[in-house]
Amino acid sequence: MPDSPGARALLTLINTQGLHARAAAVFVRALSGLNVQVLVSWEGRTVNGRSMLDLMTLGAPRGSLLEVQVSGADAEAALAALTKVVENRFYEE
């Protein structure tokens, strides 16, 4: 990641189905309008957190601990938005 403001968090997937298509779409949508780069890591794999398809390739099930790294001007706001989405089970339940 480039040298810019950044933030990092470990987020546990608590929704029933883990990081599936709809959850990935909600995750990406939470970043809309924010000037950030996002990397999401799980079990040794790292993907672009702004890409729904990349997130889906992780196949992370319920209970997975994701490492989320955010950089850019809106890093803190982005991490807060992503944390809210995950903590609210991607608004599924």
Task: For each feature predicted by the language model, list its residue ranges.
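N-terminal acidic, proline/glycine-rich, low-complexity intrinsically disordered segments
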Residues: 1-3
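Short amphipathic
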Residues: 5-15
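Amphipathic, hydrophobic secondary-structure cores in small proteins
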Residues: 19-21, 25-81
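A common structural junction motif
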Residues: 85-92
